[in-house]
UniProtKB/Swiss-Prot annotation:
Subunit structure: Part of the 50S ribosomal subunit.
Disulfide bond positions: none
Protein's name according to its UniProt entry: Large ribosomal subunit protein uL1
CDD domains hit by this protein: Ribosomal_L1
Keywords assigned by UniProt, alphabetized: Repressor, Ribonucleoprotein, Ribosomal protein, RNA-binding, rRNA-binding, Translation regulation, tRNA-binding
GO molecular function, one term: rRNA binding
GO biological process, one term: regulation of translation
Function recorded in the entry: Binds directly to 23S rRNA. The L1 stalk is quite mobile in the ribosome, and is involved in E site tRNA release. Protein L1 is also a translational repressor protein, it controls the translation of the L11 operon by binding to its mRNA.
Ranges in coiled-coil conformation: none
Classification via InterPro entries: Ribosom_uL1_bac-type, Ribosomal_uL1, Ribosomal_uL1-like, Ribosomal_uL1/biogenesis, Ribosomal_uL1_3-a/b-sand, Ribosomal_uL1_CS
GO cellular component entries: cytosolic large ribosomal subunit
Entries under NCBIfam families matching the protein: rplA_bact
């Protein structure tokens, strides 16, 4: 079992981290337990009642959080012609086709998100082994393969979060920074949960959102009572 440092132990002192909480309380306690000297990211982990080994139960999508993520996102757009100027006008940090692919083949990866127009995906496929493992490969299901590059760039810069359930059926996503405070974090969480709810596979059986935990980068996770999720979304 990994050993935790003094700051971690101090953060959880007097707190029952095994307690099952409402969403609101889990967020509040997570923010209250933050102890790092930097502005930690608040994360959520959601255990879904799906079996990802079946393609029709794969939950994958994207959502633009109302309050963003509180960080600068560097965006690269793979495109040609007029789309290059459109991407840059919308705020893209890098735009191009062959030249960008060539740079990446040489080891350059100074961007956080990638977008591509459909007509250059064959070219982008040449660097799929580089982009894929880093979560940078553009994908139509998350809206990052599109001819509407202006909208995609603006949404990505504004705090667009892509998510995908892992092999264990758990979905991980950031919700913003500790400095946002509970109200903005809860707003972002509601947007995420609404989107995940809409993506529920028709073949999924039983409880969809089975378990949830909220944590900060360095802090402990606080468990959420899944029966309170529906009430939170309807509130």
């Amino acid at each position: 079992m990994p050993k935790h440092g003094k700051k971690y132990r101090s953060a959880i002192e007097g707190r029952d981290i095994a307690e099952i909480l409402t969403l609101e309380d889990a967020v509040a306690k997570s923010l209250g337990a933050s102890f790092a000297k930097f502005d930690e990211t608040v994360d959520v982990a959601i255990c879904l009642g799906v079996d990802p080994k079946y393609s029709d139960q794969m939950v994958r999508g994207a959502v633009t959080l109302p309050h963003g993520l509180g960080k600068t996102v560097r965006v690269a757009v793979f495109c040609k012609g007029d789309k290059e100027a459109e991407a840059k006008a919308a705020g893209a940090d890098f735009a191009g086709a062959e030249e960008l692919v060539a740079k990446i083949k040489e080891g350059w990866l100074d961007f956080d998100k990638a977008i591509a127009t459909p007509d250059v995906m064959a070219l982008v496929g040449q660097i799929g082994r580089v982009l894929g493992p880093r979560g940078l490969m553009p994908n139509a299901k998350t809206g990052t393969v599109t001819f509407d590059v202006a909208t995609a760039v603006k949404e990505t810069k504004a705090g667009r979060v892509e998510f995908k359930v892992d092999k264990a059926g758990v979905l991980h996503a950031p919700l913003g920074k500790v400095s946002f405070g509970p109200e903005k974090i809860l707003d972002n969480l509601k947007s995420l949960l609404d989107t995940v709810n809409r993506l529920k596979p028709a073949t999924a059986k039983g409880t969809y959102m089975k378990a949830m935990a909220v944590s900060t980068t360095m802090g402990p996770g606080f468990k959420v009572d899944p029966t309170t999720i529906k009430k939170f979304l309807e509130g």
